[in-house]
């Protein structure tokens, strides 16, 4: 606050001076206290105090309002932060539960992987053993195939030789046998007719039953029933064949004397 300016400039004051100057005309001393300037000064001072107080009150109210708002904002921020912390705690709990579940899953997967690796090792060992066994089997099969091929070649050579010998024997004997049906034998005879040595005389013998039968004979033999009865009696098929050949030869006028190797065959001996 600026100092108040008085109307009368200040003068050096002393008690003696004050007493002389305050002596009135009637001889009674009087003291001039200059009340009005002082009063104005006091009023100005009081007004300044009132203004300061009002400004202070206004400032206090404004600050209180700001403080209340700040406290309210801080409370809201605190509540929001607490909610965020709670959410973070819940999220952390869920995350920990998820991590625990994943840990169990990883443990199970590791156990399964270990089991699979152990199984794979066993399978590899078994596969190696099987490969070795397979190689051994292949060698044996190859050796067996080579032996079988050798035997097949031998059998083929023997078959070719037997076929040639059989053909030569059939031509020499004038007799050929082949199966036409189950348990039926077709017998062809040649070298019977001297005018036509290649002429065939044939007969079919059915041996499928206990009683033999002849379903076909070309050319027919008049004594065939007797020959069949004799066959079923003595069960000597070779003797039956010789008797049939003789019967075929008897069909030719003026049959020649036996001249084939078949006629010279004696056949197996049988006791009746």
Curated annotation (Swiss-Prot):
Coiled coil, from the record: 62-174
Main localization (coarse): nucleus
CDD domains reported for this sequence: RWD_Spc25 (cd23784)
Subcellular location: Nucleus; Chromosome, Centromere, Kinetochore
Gene Ontology cellular-component terms listed: Ndc80 complex; nucleus
Keywords of this entry: Cell cycle, Cell division, Centromere, Chromosome, Coiled coil, Kinetochore, Mitosis, Nucleus
InterPro entries named among the record's database cross-references: Spc25, Spc25_C
UniProt cross-references to Gene3D superfamilies, sorted A to Z: Chromosome segregation protein Spc25 (3.30.457.50)
Top-level taxon: Eukaryota
Gene Ontology BP terms: cell division; chromosome segregation
Subunit-structure text: Component of the NDC80 complex, which consists of at least NDC80, NUF2 and SPC25.
Function: Acts as a component of the essential kinetochore-associated NDC80 complex, which is required for chromosome segregation and spindle checkpoint activity.
Family: Belongs to the SPC25 family.
PANTHER family: KINETOCHORE PROTEIN SPC25 (PTHR14281:SF0), KINETOCHORE PROTEIN SPC25-RELATED (PTHR14281)
Designated name of the protein: Probable kinetochore protein SPC25
Biological source species: Cryptococcus neoformans var. neoformans serotype D (strain JEC21 / ATCC MYA-565)
